[in-house]
């Protein structure tokens, strides 16, 4: 049994070798010749999986180690009788922590308190729900918009996108990309929406590039609209609008979900799905794969205020480490993908062990996802 895996999927070689012969291949583009005798294909979001790639090939199963699936033609796979699995929620924690790292940086730079801001969350799936929970643990007001979930009657106080635009100080997008249909998200943030944002608002896109109309956004910024922008995703990736990058406050190369934990979850989820598909079901404990964190433990004295939270968050991950490299190489062919391929190891907040002498600080840090314990001062 021959299994092709994206060369940038961590732990894929070791895990899938339990099931068959593994060949690691680049994801963009997939070497077509390798598909001629392969039984399974494991990809990331950079690989377009469709009829033109797989027609006439012996592939029986496709797995994507990503939460999003807009790069996969699921309807064609089903029609062709090819098994499929994604990894929903695998990188949700990573994306939430990316948003926090960005907001805390902007808050420090611009001198505002996050506790005084209202955050509008567009898309309340695995990422949106976790973001809502962590913001509300801090007492930060959130507004939720998710028309598909609202129409299904899912639990939640869902509001219209227009209301979020009018009321939110921060608007952050966490939707799939739907190019048409009743829940179309292509250019959901169009020129009209962008111009309607509150003066001084923050706009964040960490889902799919085309959810925000990049041309319209650049037009608004060039005209002097007072707006802070965080973009991790771009229309036309791996190409991007260099002029737009110059205008945004934080720009990164589609790495919001790139924690080691998130990548490992993606790999293990598709591994478990494929093992079940072939009748040799196996399960993997994530902590058996991950290395020991580099931070060890730290001690925190007193309550948890915003500056202290910012220091803890940026100790684990400071978004500026990914902004600067992109600006240096933007516009050079191949460099966007190279930044992603050679991405420095990044961990989640749970890797940081915090000893607190304040019980409320320990409790709050645990709610936020840190590994915190309370030890009273002596």
From Swiss-Prot:
It comes from Escherichia coli (strain ATCC 8739 / DSM 1576 / NBRC 3972 / NCIMB 8545 / WDCM 00012 / Crooks). Its main location: cytoplasm. Pathway: Cofactor biosynthesis; pyridoxine 5'-phosphate biosynthesis; pyridoxine 5'-phosphate from D-erythrose 4-phosphate: step 2/5. It is an enzyme of class 1 (oxidoreductase). The keyword NAD applies. NAD(+) binds at residues 146, 175, 232, 257. GO terms for molecular function: 4-phosphoerythronate dehydrogenase activity; NAD binding; protein dimerization activity. Homodimer. It catalyses: 4-phospho-D-erythronate + NAD(+) = (R)-3-hydroxy-2-oxo-4-phosphooxybutanoate + NADH + H(+). Belongs to the D-isomer specific 2-hydroxyacid dehydrogenase family. PdxB subfamily. The gene is pdxB. Pfam families: 2-Hacid_dh, 2-Hacid_dh_C, DUF3410. Keywords: Cytoplasm, NAD, Oxidoreductase, Pyridoxine biosynthesis. Substrate binds at residues 45, 66, 258. GO terms for biological process: 'de novo' pyridoxal 5'-phosphate biosynthetic process; pyridoxine biosynthetic process. The active site is at 208, 237, 254 (proton donor). This is Erythronate-4-phosphate dehydrogenase. Its EC number is 1.1.1.290.
